[in-house]
Curated annotation (Swiss-Prot):
Keyword tRNA processing: yes
Stated role: Catalyzes the base-exchange of a guanine (G) residue with the queuine precursor 7-aminomethyl-7-deazaguanine (PreQ1) at position 34 (anticodon wobble position) in tRNAs with GU(N) anticodons (tRNA-Asp, -Asn, -His and -Tyr). Catalysis occurs through a double-displacement mechanism. The nucleophile active site attacks the C1' of nucleotide 34 to detach the guanine base from the RNA, forming a covalent enzyme-RNA intermediate. The proton acceptor active site deprotonates the incoming PreQ1, allowing a nucleophilic attack on the C1' of the ribose to form the product.
GO molecular function, one term: tRNA-guanosine(34) queuine transglycosylase activity
Organism name: Haemophilus ducreyi (strain 35000HP / ATCC 700724)
A GO term from the CC aspect: cytosol
The encoding gene: tgt
Descriptive protein name: Queuine tRNA-ribosyltransferase
Pathway annotation from the record: tRNA modification; tRNA-queuosine biosynthesis
This protein's UniProt keywords: Glycosyltransferase, Metal-binding, Queuosine biosynthesis, Transferase, tRNA processing, Zinc
């Protein structure tokens, strides 16, 4: 069970709360929320306790990868994904659609589903909307995503239309199988339509007719210019139900989160804070620190004076530079702790600004600190 409560707004920005019924009682996710990505049932290099300490309340797991390894049977032997990875908060799982897109020539898309070559074993396997619902049921996902085709960019109007229409048919099949399983959790629809406004409108209408607990905006952050992403968000979010959460999939940089919230988005996920951390790319209050730069070799200041994370409270830039130079695992861990905490602090600041109805002022201050211009906002009136 999942409930969404819209608590306050500031412009298009929304402050809300998701409530989940878990075996240990009710769990809350304050929105706008950022979900760290635990592809294989782990946020890389972090224990669940460490992830929780950054302020994260919900994680994302990857249906496709967990299906291939360790598989449904091993998952069921433990109970579900929560028991397997020992994270007892809510988990959202994606449906596998994006991973299938990324396989490129290794996959063949038909009406029934997708046949592809297992990237691990080389064998041919088949994933359908029904199978995706069954895997996510066994994972015990608190938020299940429908199986869709993530339309690649660029796409012709003809291709994008066919792709969106098939995704709608798959959405209906996902809903039917989800209900047949008597899954008590939440099911989210995914809006497709590439960069074509009329297709996005048609997709939203079709999904609302089927009926979902929340709505994701998919098919963005797949190579399109930022201006295009902003334009499609500005067009799409006003069409979505006010009383349901909105999720922007696979996004993104700190400024992308701010821009998503400006356009009415409630939930985000991205590998960026964790992947960038392992590459020495660290997010700080006034921009970015690339810790591999030799200028940090003798720098005895903390990474970010405004940050309260374990890394910033205990270590200097010189130490983090040293760990990275030596290839020490601890360096990647400390970097990850910081980046995840940065993202959660950013979301907390966003929520507070919406509560105080001063989100526009927050946006101006945020961009001033990182030395960038505030992108224009051209919201469509419906």
């Amino acid at each position: 069970m999942m409930k969404y409560e819209l608590k306050s707004t500031s412009g298009m920005a929304r402050r809300g709360r998701l409530t989940f019924s878990r075996p240990q009682g009710e769990c809350y996710v304050e929105t706008p929320a950022f979900m760290p990505v635990g592809t294989y049932g782990t946020v890389k290099g972090m224990t669940p306790e460490e992830v929780k300490a950054t302020g994260a309340q919900i994680l994302l797991g990857n249906t496709f990868h967990l299906w291939l390894r360790p598989g449904q049977e091993i998952m069921k032997m433990h109970g579900d994904l929560h028991d397997f990875m020992q994270w007892h908060g809510p988990i959202l799982t994606d449906s596998g659609g994006f991973q299938v897109l990324s396989l490129g020539k290794l996959r063949k898309i038909k009406e029934e589903g997708v046949t592809f070559q297992n990237p691990i074993s080389g064998e041919k396997i088949f994933l359908s909307p029904e199978k995706s619902m069954e895997i996510q049921y066994d994972l015990g996902s608190d938020i299940v995503m429908i199986f869709d085709e993530c339309t690649p960019y660029p796409a012709t109007l003809e291709y994008a239309k066919k792709s969106m229409e098939m995704s709608l048919r798959w959405a209906k099949r996902s809903r039917t199988r989800f209900d047949e399983l008597a899954n008590p959790r939440a099911l989210f629809g995914i809006v497709q339509g590439s960069t074509y406004e009329e297709l996005r409108r048609e997709s939203v209408k079709g999904l609302i007719n089927i009926g979902f607990d929340g709505y994701a905006v998919g098919g963005l952050a797949v190579g399109e210019p930022k201006e295009e992403m902003h334009r499609i968000l500005e067009f799409t979010t006003p069409l979505l139900p006010q009383d349901k959460p909105r999720y922007l999939m696979g996004v993104g940089k700190p400024e992308d989160l701010v821009e998503g919230v400006r356009r009415g988005i409630d939930m985000f996920d991205c590998v960026m804070p964790t992947r960038n951390a392992r590459n020495g790319h660290l997010f700080v209050s006034d921009g970015v620190v690339k810790i591999r730069n030799a200028k940090y070799k003798n720098d005895t200041t903390p990474l970010d004076a405004e940050c309260d994370c374990y890394t910033c409270k205990n270590y200097t830039k010189a130490y983090l530079y040293h760990l990275d130079k030596c290839g020490e695992i601890l360096g990647a861990r400390l970097n990850t702790i910081h980046n995840l905490r940065y993202y959660q602090r950013l979301m907390a600041q966003i929520r507070q600004a919406i509560e105080q109805d001063c989100f526009d002022e927050f946006v101006v201050e945020f961009y001033a600190k990182i030395g960038k211009e505030v992108p224009p906002l051209h919201l469509k009136s419906e």
